[in-house]
């Protein structure tokens, strides 16, 4: 005989989904989400309807356009010609905003992302550039290679204005920049003896040759803080020390790209002889702009050829730069730091 006053309810229904293990059913009772690529599934117990499976849209339905090749344009190169399906993308990073909206598109069948280093209209000093935001944003878009284009002064007679150089070494004489993603409870020391990607550098040099542009396949780029140009004494010192070209931006990008495990190489467009050459006047901004205007078309051709010639395979060590660089015990890294650097360190510190 049944006891009076006691209502017997049927046990809660269970979710019988073929891809869900029995141990995960309890997750659904707490409204936890399982998130396949295109669908969020939520399973909850309703007092009258039993277990209900509902579909909800992802939090971010709009996906950012992806790109595999990032191009950073410097002085004189503020856009990239021939981009199909172009779209502006504005990205917020934990380090602030990039220099400019990034333009993504298709070149020679490959997706690229173009970023004007100094902003459109050349509004940002070398010291003011948010280098971390620039590299981080390109990483977020999926870039695994970065090609940089910049103006430089020559410290050698044989490196003439109008010619290009693909630097293989850098010397850092900057003073007022943050050139690392790390800190905040996480220490890392990446190997930087070879600061550029040899495979990418070879593609850039070969592309210059293909386009009929005289190119020097290696050289040492000294990076000064600026924005002033060198004194005569500094120019002679740089020559005495064996440096080849001088600029104000590339070494900071190269360091951050290495920490982000991105291939990086630079096309240095020679615009002047700095101030050391007795047969040439001291460098001026107007002189640089005039030479850059002559070289801009060459740079556009070289970039298109480089994108076309870029192999899908990577034969370098850039993508594993952090494998032996992270020093701090993962258990001691602050959660906020892990979250901030997740796109960079995620595969090492989930």
Residue ranges and their predicted role:
Residues 211-244:
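Active-site/ligand-binding-proximal alpha/beta "capping" segment
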Residues 315-350:
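A short, charged, Gly/Pro-tolerant segment at domain boundaries
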Residues 275-322:
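His/Asp/Glu-rich mid-to-C-terminal helical/loop segments that flank catalytic regions of hydrolases
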Residues 53-193, 349-350:
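Metabolite-binding pocket within alpha/beta catalytic cores that recognizes anionic/polar moieties
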Residues 248-286:
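Zn-dependent metallopeptidase/amidohydrolase metal-coordination segment
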Residues 139-142, 239, 258:
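Non-catalytic positions within long, well-ordered alpha-helices that form the structural scaffold/packing
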Residues 199, 203-214, 301-309:
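Generic non-transmembrane alpha-helical segments
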